[in-house]
């Protein structure tokens, strides 16, 4: 079912892009500056265990060439469990995104970037907070679609990633992971404004 929804969404994007070829639409070019952001909410429940989450990730980007944009972003997140344990995440990332058809209203993209995050969990039962630091690299495919001359919708789906995670305590060992995820469990939507 998820694959059917994804296929329908991609087909709708492609159809809309072709249907509006004659209309005035936005596009990207060398030296363009833009701001972008994603906003996410989540809620998971399994029996009595419930978790809710919120994430906000603003970024700023600049086109170095007609096809390549450099992006710098921040990330803020918060997850809360039913027992009132709370995890707060703060991160920064730096990356580049390649636009296959930047002068068009619709473009497939592929992005790659580095990210550093710090997550702090405070426990409702008391005790010391748990702090975890993570560094990672990811490559992800996506799409960009201009809905006006300045505003564009963007989406990225999944990632090929490497992450190294380590608790912020003396003597802790790092945990390294490598993954490939190209399904709807890792999809991000955002809005872009081009100056």
What do the predicted segments below correspond to?
Residues 67-70, 104-106, 145, 150-153:
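Repeated loop/turn-to-beta-strand initiation elements of outer-membrane beta-barrel proteins
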Residues 66, 71-102:
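Mid-chain, structured segments of secreted extracytoplasmic proteins
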Residues 23-24, 78-82, 142, 147-195:
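Predominantly the C-terminal beta-signal and adjacent terminal strand-loop region
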Residues 37-41, 58-62, 74-76, 92-98, ...:
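Residues on the lipid-exposed face of transmembrane beta-strands in outer-membrane beta-barrel proteins
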Residues 4-11, 15-36, 98-101:
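Outer-membrane beta-barrel biogenesis signature
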Residues 20-66, 70-73, 186-195:
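Short glycine/proline- and aromatic-enriched beta-strand/turn motifs that initiate or cap beta-hairpins
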Residues 31-33, 50-56, 86-92, 106, ...:
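Residues that define the transmembrane beta-barrel architecture of outer-membrane proteins
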Residues 45-54, 80-90, 119-133, 165-175:
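Outer-membrane beta-barrel translocator domains and adjoining extracellular loop/strand segments
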């Amino acid at each position: 079912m998820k694959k059917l929804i994804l296929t329908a969404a991609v087909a709708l994007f492609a159809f809309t892009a072709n249907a509006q070829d004659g209309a005035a639409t936005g596009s990207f070019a060398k030296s363009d500056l833009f701001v972008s952001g994603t906003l996410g909410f989540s809620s998971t429940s399994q029996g009595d265990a419930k978790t809710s989450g919120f994430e906000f990730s603003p970024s700023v980007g600049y086109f170095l060439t007609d096809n390549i944009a450099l992006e710098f972003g921040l990330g803020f997140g918060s997850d809360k469990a039913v027992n009132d344990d709370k995890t707060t995440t703060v991160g920064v990332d730096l990356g580049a995104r390649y636009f296959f058809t930047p002068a068009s209203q619709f473009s497939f993209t592929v992005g790659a970037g580095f990210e550093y995050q710090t997550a702090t969990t405070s426990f409702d039962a008391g005790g010391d907070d748990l702090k975890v630091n993570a560094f990672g690299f990811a490559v992800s495919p996506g799409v960009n679609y201009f809905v006006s001359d300045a505003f564009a919708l963007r989406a990225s789906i999944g990632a090929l990633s490497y992450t190294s995670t380590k608790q912020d305590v003396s003597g802790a060992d790092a945990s390294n992971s490598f993954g490939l995820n190209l399904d709807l469990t890792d999809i991000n939507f955002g809005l872009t404004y081009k100056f």
